[in-house]
Amino acid sequence: MDPYAERYPHLSPYCSFACNPIRYTDETGGVITIVSVEDQTKFYEAMAKLFNDKAGNFSFNSDGQLKYNGDTKGLSRDQKNILDGLRKVMDSKENTTVSFGKSITIKDKNGNDVKINTSDGGGAFTILQAEAIEKEFDVSSNIILIDPDATSTQVEAVTDAYYGDWSNLSLGARTEIVDVLLNVPDMISHEIGHVLNAGKTQDKVIDFNNKARKILGLPKRRYDTNHNERKR
């Protein structure tokens, strides 16, 4: 049985290579890849804001694969949690690519271009391999794209009434529009949270993200209509 079956609810847990070994050939995977030197520099700068001098323990091999070689002495609990999340993605069965820009173009199963903009995701987005298979995109890894210029976005935050009886109007508004401050290390942690919590309730993405936001001195992010205990 595939130990990552929960990430692919639309597939049989006994279905290796997503039942398509021609397109999805990497069963063991397990890397975060950042190809361009410019993007690697942006990533290093983000890690320095999260881990201070420990950011020097990150390195890339000739293929752009991210490694962490060093201890965690002196890191806070939140820093250790974020590093643990990064390591889990690096050691997972799936490959994850990270790049920086405004948009990315991928192919569908018929070879047609599909353009996805970071503005559609509030400054960053993640295409999970599970979603790519379901939508028949021709990709073989999780894809993270970060807009390095994004500084804020708006989300539809949920209130306590969101979890109550929707027919009871006395509970008040279920959602409200709120501004969310962003920066590059914050967005990286958020998107890594999506990879970590694929197939799980998406409040866990915010919980992970808020550990990084605390390190960065950003306000705690609220759950919203796309990230809450009812959303998978």
Task: List each language-model region with its residue ranges.
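Catalytic glutamate of the conserved HExxH
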Residues: 20, 184-187, 191-195, 199
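Predominantly extracellular/secreted Zn2+-dependent metalloproteases
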Residues: 30-185, 198-232
